[in-house]
Amino acid sequence: METRNVEISALRTLRDGFLYLLVAVIMGIVAAFGFIVAVPHGPSAFAGVVGTVATLLIMLLVAVGMALYAIFGKIRPGMRQLSEVDNGFRICYTGTTLMLVGLVIVVLGIIVLAAVFAAAGFSPEALRGTVVSGLDLALGVLLIGGIIAFIGHIMTFVVGAFKLHGKYQNSLYMAAGILFVVDIVLLLVGIYGILTSVGYILMYIALGDTINRLTTATATPAQV
């Protein structure tokens, strides 16, 4: 019974995470389209959109914060709990760790990049010698961090979806995993996000169904 309670708690935490991710994606899409519409078409129009752009920027930052909370505040602990029930999910928990490490490295790369431009005084002529080396270092750090986070993303979402399907036999998990894979392929041609958003919806629905089945099975007394 204790193990089943941990399992249900883990799935509920994961479900909350995918809900937060979905909301974050929607907010991000709204903000992105808002930026496109709000782009001023002349000097006189610029002043009129400053407030709108500021609002959309705040919305975008909130979406990013919500996505980070979803991954590291919900999905990461959910995978950790689930790995206590089924050790096969340990790889998914490790994936969230790689995403965290990759994010930290990317942030460090951004800091180095900002320091390089600050040292150069934003002057192209100053970007020589050691400054150029610093720029190469910053870009290298960003690339490494991005690759680590990307690998973690695959381990968490793609592998996670397929492992959930293998354990609970709900085809929606499989469908979500396939959508995640296809969207990664589309990323190579500059199109990303739509199929992943649908995958989040499928994961949310599938997790709800699994939780209901496990809860019902727990509440139903065993037949003698």
Say what each PLM segment does.
Residues 130-136:
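Helix-boundary and loop/linker segments of multi-pass membrane transporters
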Residues 136-153:
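Extracellular-loop-to-transmembrane junctions of the mid-late helices
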Residues 1-122, 127, 150-184, 192-224:
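Membrane-interface extramembranous regions at the lipid-water interface
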